[in-house]
Amino acid sequence: MQRYAVVLAAGKGTRMKSKLYKVLHKVADKTMIEHVVNSVQQSGADQIVTIVGHGAERVKDTLGDQSAYGFQEEQLGTAHAVKMAADELKDREGTTLVVCGDTPLITADTLNALVKHHEDNQADATVLSATAPNPFGYGRIVRDEEGRLSNIVEQKDASEAEQQIDEISSGIFAFDNQTLFRLLDKVKNDNAQGEYYLPDVLSLILEEGGKAEVYHTNDFDEIMGVNDRVALSKAEQAMRQRINEYHMRNGVTLIDPSSTYIASDVIIGMDTVIEPGVHIGSGTQIGEDTVIGQYSDINRSTIGDRTTVKQSVINDATVGDDTTVGPFAQLRPNAHLGNEVKVGNFVEVKKADIKDGAKVSHLSYIGDAEIGERTNIGCGSITVNYDGKNKFKTIIGKDSFIGCNTNLVAPVILGDDVLIAAGSTITDDVPNDSLALARSRQTTKPGYLNKNKE
């Protein structure tokens, strides 16, 4: 059976008190709408329609061609929002999921279980419910004496008795697609909020003698809606715990999970150790037997096996196997470190290729450069790559030694087995097997200070 999904993402999110559109706030380094759409995709939806309103273009920029779009100009309720998908889905046969764009913790497994329950029971509609520790603000699941769904009552329309019910509607549904779009036009807005409620479709189904089911999940966190910064923080904590537990169960040691932040798409090999205070952002892959030292920040980068990163910042870079980075190093975009490389304390690398076995141990800037195998860069060495207008490249061959406090003024090429004397400013190319010395000769005047004291 074909499966479709409508993702509701048109609400402005006033309670967030933000200039940023609500579903674009991030949880675990990814926007809420991306989390939801990814889960819907993983659940096997053949087509997704995202309903946008406020901030529509930014949502489209975020999701791109992962979804088709419907536009809700006025926020007149959830049933009205789903109607905006009619052009894409109205005449299709199959099951349609309706999912809220502000439920970033929902998983593909739960969506699949909801659809399976719906289809196995040949229902016209099925609502996903949960037991809430504090049900205030949620629609309540009202059951009849036999435990079957009788109604879904929104908070503002609930009686005192109904407000005591702790089984709540998640706002996530599975519908027979043609039944859904046939009944949407019959939904009325005679309620406390003057809105067209999607749960009223279930009431219409029951009135017609159709079948409406409830599928209950035991994990309330999955269906938690994020409407303000407090809920955003709770979602972040829950997502972080889920992600961290996943990695620990797959052979990764997290010394202090409560202070470790790992994005949802990060890949980490077994027997790697993550120390406290580490942030690993989206698009990062880390190998096996590696140590990521405390307070390191790594984003969109690849780190190899048996490598150690100590208190460093790495963005859009690659680091090979058996390599050491830090402490207090910065790898900027397009920094590429080979195997058995050392980049030490207070070294900055940008758009540079440092080959296997090379060392840049202290207080250096390596930018727009290529460093050959086993070359050693002395303390305080700088590739002078910028003339105020353009960037130029420095190339250093293999097995070379660059003395301390040197300036390599690009464009410049240094060959293999080259020795650059400490304190030199190199402006010309240096051929293989050469010594280059470019500094003033030392002048010493014995007794000079004694003469000045007389």
Curated annotation (Swiss-Prot):
Keywords attached to this entry: Acyltransferase, Cell shape, Cell wall biogenesis/degradation, Cytoplasm, Magnesium, Metal-binding, Multifunctional enzyme, Nucleotidyltransferase, Peptidoglycan synthesis, Repeat, Transferase
One Gene Ontology cellular component: membrane
InterPro entries in the cross-refs: Bifunctional_GlmU, GlmU-like, GlmU_C_LbH, Hexapep, Hexapep_transf_CS, NTP_transferase_dom, Nucleotide-diphossugar_trans, Trimer_LpxA-like_sf
Reactions this protein catalyses: alpha-D-glucosamine 1-phosphate + acetyl-CoA = N-acetyl-alpha-D-glucosamine 1-phosphate + CoA + H(+); N-acetyl-alpha-D-glucosamine 1-phosphate + UTP + H(+) = UDP-N-acetyl-alpha-D-glucosamine + diphosphate
One of the GO biological process terms: UDP-N-acetylglucosamine biosynthetic process
Cofactor(s) it depends on: Mg(2+)
GO MF annotation terms: glucosamine-1-phosphate N-acetyltransferase activity; magnesium ion binding; UDP-N-acetylglucosamine diphosphorylase activity
Residue span of region Linker: 230-250
Region (N-acetyltransferase): 251-454
Binding residues for Mg(2+): D102, N227
EC number: 2.7.7.23, 2.3.1.157
Metabolic or biological pathway, per its Swiss-Prot or TrEMBL entry: Nucleotide-sugar biosynthesis; UDP-N-acetyl-alpha-D-glucosamine biosynthesis; N-acetyl-alpha-D-glucosamine 1-phosphate from alpha-D-glucosamine 6-phosphate (route II): step 2/2; Nucleotide-sugar biosynthesis; UDP-N-acetyl-alpha-D-glucosamine biosynthesis; UDP-N-acetyl-alpha-D-glucosamine from N-acetyl-alpha-D-glucosamine 1-phosphate: step 1/1; Bacterial outer membrane biogenesis; LPS lipid A biosynthesis
Chain segments carrying region Pyrophosphorylase: 1-229
Major subcellular site: cytoplasm
Residues given in the record as UDP-N-acetyl-alpha-D-glucosamine binding sites: 8-11, 22, 72, 77-78, 139, 154, 227, 332, 350, 365, 376
Compartmental location: Cytoplasm
PROSITE patterns in the cross-refs: HEXAPEP_TRANSFERASES (PS00101)
The keyword Phosphoprotein belongs to this UniProt entry's keyword annotation: no
Binding-site residues, acetyl-CoA: N385, Y386, A422, R439
Family as reported in the entry's similarity comment: In the N-terminal section; belongs to the N-acetylglucosamine-1-phosphate uridyltransferase family.
NCBIfam families in UniProt: glmU, PRK14354.1
Function: Catalyzes the last two sequential reactions in the de novo biosynthetic pathway for UDP-N-acetylglucosamine (UDP-GlcNAc). The C-terminal domain catalyzes the transfer of acetyl group from acetyl coenzyme A to glucosamine-1-phosphate (GlcN-1-P) to produce N-acetylglucosamine-1-phosphate (GlcNAc-1-P), which is converted into UDP-GlcNAc by the transfer of uridine 5-monophosphate (from uridine 5-triphosphate), a reaction catalyzed by the N-terminal domain.
Known partners and oligomeric status: Homotrimer.
Name the record gives this protein: Bifunctional protein GlmU
Source organism (scientific name): Staphylococcus carnosus (strain TM300)
